[in-house]
Amino acid sequence: MTHIVTDTPLWKKLSDHHWEVVGTHLRELFDTDPDRGVDLIVTAADLYIDYSKHRVTRETMGLLVDLARAAGVERHREAMFTGAHINTSEDRAVLHTALRANPERELIVDGQDVVGDVHTVLRRMGEFTDRVRSGAWRGATGERIRTVVNIGIGGSDLGPAMAYRALRHYVDGPEVRFVSNIDPADLLSNLTDLDPRTTLFVVVSKTFSTLETMTNASAARRWITEALGEHAVPRHFVAVSTDEERVTAFGITARNIFGFWEWVGGRYSVGSAAGLSVMIAIGRERFTEFLGGMRAIDEHFRTTPLESNAPVILGMLGVWYSSFFGADARAVLPYAHDLARFPAYLQQLTMESNGKSVRTDGTPVGTFTGEIFWGEPGTNGQHAFHQLLHQGTHLIPVDFLGFAEPIEDLPTLDGIGSVHDVLTANLFAQSKVLAFGKNADEVAADGTPSALVPHKVMSGNRPSTTILGAKLTPSTLGQLIALYEHQVFVQGIVWGIDSFDQWGVELGKTSALELGPALWDLDGAAYVGDSSTTGLIRTYRLARGERRCLP
């Protein structure tokens, strides 16, 4: 039976404490504890994390850490790092941390030398990367590869696409494009200006049977063979998969298969062979730096006491707002345009992991779980949705991400200052205004007409974290990824759920396969068991000019 922490006296104590804190404004918290902006910070590797603008006291943080400890975060953390089968519903180890482990580390799990296997694949990836980047690997007509197209979906797309966008200044290899959606527009728009002779496809699918991925891969194969012939397939396709039989049947040679393992889920796989396209783009040395950034946070998470452990603190703040305040969402706002896809990446990482309503033992959870992650880069969001963050009725904690040193910069209008400084001033201003706001007296003191005062009041007391890195590099990107990965783990342990399965995505897949014939089998009946779906199919078929066998 799962240890149900929500039924413990400690949970009750936190619930009672919440009612003591909920009526206290952040202005008051800073007035009574002026050093909190110095003390309520934590550093992890190259990241400076300020959590002082949260609706917590020092007592709150002590209780949250006590809750993490009581839930068994330390014990389960060690179980994860050492290969225990903590993914209980699938009876699997959870070893994404092994993907970035030092090669000298020994880890035997289920009779396999996990770290040795990882570095064998990394070496093969590096050798292949060097061949593509140097021009030693060429297409069927002898042309050098100029574009790599990554075909995958979910973790086989979101992580690599995010990392490629984030690290664009470090790209000195072939251009990489990403195709994920089964909508033909995705593949066709990416192929329209490409030359088959200079294009290499990386097909990423653990089973090599994922519907969307294999539909796109098959279409890409036709594109190659129609232009270059069947013999060209082995020179224009490689695979990231565990199913050699299916891959070789597709026409890819076995030596061009890069494997990964059941113990790494898709949303945790960007540091595995699923990141091959990123390695080709930035080179094996920078990819190693990327893995090193993840490893630095792994080591911080594994060895740092809970009281100063960044993933524990941030994960428990998420529990605080979700389970005690009833907050549904967290906004992640990177003030770095190259991190534009980072919120979308976090959506899968966090919501597929912790969007669960039963505990590991199958019993219903007793609290809200999971957070809805969303966001856009600053300052764009300030002209879109920040209005709701500042004056809306929803409580939405915010994570601000920023960097001290820009990779590229421009002068201000007067030619004196730095536009990056202006960007960062906006980041700090948003954090400050969310926390402290502007009350009616302050608005009126500006000469605002009395009728307009209520409209201009900013209530403040809106919580946020600010995470600052020195510069956006492969290492700091890896650090950010691991920082959020381990937050997910901490929350899952406290809520008693399995953060590493995703059964909720399966029924939709099977239902789509069942419904498909009603759309394209024009001699079959369109009725599928309920009037709504039947009506949608009928409307769809009529719009496509097909009237046979309609109810």
UniProtKB/Swiss-Prot annotation:
It comes from Rhodococcus jostii (strain RHA1). Its EC number is 5.3.1.9. Pathway: Carbohydrate biosynthesis; gluconeogenesis; Carbohydrate degradation; glycolysis; D-glyceraldehyde 3-phosphate and glycerone phosphate from D-glucose: step 2/4. It is found in: Cytoplasm. It catalyses: alpha-D-glucose 6-phosphate = beta-D-fructose 6-phosphate. One of its GO terms (molecular function) is carbohydrate derivative binding. Gene3D superfamilies: 1.10.1390.10, Glucose-6-phosphate isomerase like protein, domain 1. Belongs to the GPI family. GO terms for cellular component: cytosol. It holds the Pfam family PGI. InterPro entries: G6P_Isomerase (IPR001672), G6P_Isomerase_C (IPR023096), Phosphoglucose_isomerase_CS (IPR018189), SIS_dom_sf (IPR046348), SIS_PGI_1 (IPR035476), SIS_PGI_2 (IPR035482). It is an enzyme of class 5 (isomerase). Keywords: Cytoplasm, Gluconeogenesis, Glycolysis, Isomerase, Plasmid. This is Glucose-6-phosphate isomerase 2. Catalyzes the reversible isomerization of glucose-6-phosphate to fructose-6-phosphate. The active site is at 352 (proton donor), 383, 509. GO terms for biological process: gluconeogenesis; glucose 6-phosphate metabolic process; glycolytic process.
